[in-house]
Each structure stands twice: as structure tokens, then as C-alpha cells.
Amino acid sequence: ASVIKNYQLELDYLDVGGGYYGIFHNAPTFDEYAEAIYESLQKQGLEKLTIIVEPGNALTAAAFSYYSRVIDTKHLPDCILLTTDGSRNDVDPFFRKERYMTEIHREKEEAEVVPLQIVAGATCLEYDQLFRLENQPELCVGDMIEYKNVGAYTLTLTPMFINYFPRVYSLSSDGMKLIRDKWTAKEYMQKSNI
């Protein structure tokens, strides 16, 4: 706000960008961000200036869950390797996350507890390991893994390497509605002149 005054700028609006984490514990709330921005502008007599906020990830990350299904299991001497129909590309396009908020949806209620399971994606890339389960009931083909709080950028940054774009559903009080069907080679090639 002081820069606006010092340089006598006449602005129609001020874009304060993004990077707000109001949904996470021990982070300022959206109200606290708004109050801090307003107080700074008010000190300079700019409280009527239009503010544009780009909260993106802070709002939409919590609005999305991503589901993948176990499609194969391989019993190795020291662990069970689980291959899913999803990929780390779909839940972590910047490859920075060390943990995911997950919930397992099992087809069978009871399963044997096993020492180590490694959940991997469907690509052949070495970084496509999603997480490890230690001393948990064994997952089987058909079990679903829900990744919570993903989606802010994953819908636009997911590469079409091995897997094409997944189905996208909207959930409301009226129920679930398919808003984008899963892509196939047909959609991938639709604008190509080969």
C-alpha cells in the first residue's frame, strides 16, 4: 500500500496473488488474510480499492478427491507391490509431496495384516511410488484408494503419459454427476491430422 502512495499510482485494482493456506492447521485463516490486507490499505487511505485474490489451491485443493483402483499385486520377498490405475502425476504434478491424505475403500472387510505394501502408479517411472503401508491389512485387486485434498492444479497439469485424463464428477446435494468422461485415444487424437 505504501508503494501505491509513494509513487502516486492510480490503480483500478490490486491483485494480491495466491498462496493462501486458510484450510490448513496452524495457518492464517482467510479472514485473517483479508483483515491484514484491509488494514494495510486503510492506513494509506486505500480501503475502497478493488482487491483481486487468487486463492486457487487453498480453495480448490480441499474440494477434490482423486480415486484410483488397485489393478495388480506382486508378492516380493520383502514387500507387496501394488500397482494402481492412477499415477503420482495425477495427485502431485510437482512431485513435492511426501505424504498424501488417503482413505482405503476395501472390497473385502477383513484381510491379513502384512508388514509392507508399496503403492505405485501405472507408469514405468521410478518416481511413481505414491506411499507405503506398514502393518496394514493387505490390499487386493479392486480396492480403491481415495486421495483427499488434491486437484487444484492436477486437472490441468496431468500429462497424458500412459494414462489419459480421468473421469471428473461433481458432487452436490442432488447427487453425483459426470462432468468429464475419461479420455481415450480417440479424444487424444481428435485434433490431429495424421
Could you describe each region identified by the protein language model?
Residues A1-T73, Q136:
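Active-site loop/helix belt of alpha/beta enzymes
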Residues A36, T50-I194:
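Charged (often Lys/Glu-rich) extended helix/loop segments that serve as interaction or gating elements
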